[in-house]
Amino acid sequence: PIKSSAASDVYKRQAWEFLTEVIKLDKNRLYVTVYPDDQEAYDTWHNDCGVEESHITRLEDNFWEIGEGPCGPDSEIFFDQGPEHGCDDPNCAPGCDCDRYLEIWNLVFTQFNKMPDGSYEPLQHKNIDTGAGLERLASVLQGCKTNFETDLIFPIIEATAKRAGVTYNENPNTDVSLKVIADHARAVTALISDGVLPSNEGRGYVLRRILRRAVRHGRLLGIE
C-alpha cells in the first residue's frame, strides 16, 4: 500500500497555496492527478486543499521510476488552458495527449527501492522531490500559447526575426528556425557561462553541436 508522510502533505499544501494565493491562478482551472493506490494523496488534495473531486484524476502513470533504484508515487498539477486547446473528446482530462491540460507542477514521494527482480522494498530514508516549470508558469500567467512567446524567450525570437528580415507566425518552417535559435542561444549562454568551450569531447562537444545547429537554422533564415 502507498503511505504518504506528513511532509509530503505539507508540500502539496504549499504548492497549492503558491499557485492559488501567491500567483493567484484560478482554482477552477487547476486539476491534480494521483496514483490509483495513493488514497492519502487524494485525501490531502480534497480535504486539506479543497480540490473538488471532479478535478482529481487517478492515473497509473503517476508512479515515478527509472529502472532499478529509488522510486515512488507522484502527484501532478495541471492548468486547464481551455477547450480551444483540446481534442474535442468529451472525456478529455489531465493525461490526454492534447494541449488542453498543461502540467505545471510535479511532486514525487520517493518511498520504494525497485530491486533487480522487479520487486519493491520500502526505503529506510524516504524523501520528496518537487518542482514547478518556470517557463510553463510564465506562459500561463502571461496568457501565451507556448513557452516561446513568453517575455523570457520571445525577445530573442524578435531580434532574430528582425535580423533575418522575416515575421514570426507567418511561416511554420520559419517559426521552427526562430525557436531553435532562441532555445539554442539560451543553452549556449548557460554552457559558456559555466566555463564550457567548444571542443571535440565531453560537454565541449555538446556545445559545439548546439552551435552548429543554431548556425544551420540561421542560414535557413538567410542569415550569413
Regions found by a protein language model. Name each.
Residues 1-7, 11:
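Single conserved hydrophobic/aromatic residue that forms the stacking wall/gate
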Residues 9-134, 138-151, 170, 179-180, ...:
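Active-site cavity-forming subdomains of large catalytic enzyme subunits
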Residues 90, 153, 201-204, 221-224:
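Composition- and surface-driven signal marking solvent-exposed, interaction-prone regions
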Residues 147-161, 179, 224:
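Substrate-binding beta-hairpin/strand module that engages nucleic acids
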Residues 155-169, 173-175:
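Alpha-helical cores of eukaryotic small-GTPase signaling modules
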Residues 160, 164, 213-224:
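Intrinsic disorder at enzyme termini
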Residues 175-195, 201-218:
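Core structural elements
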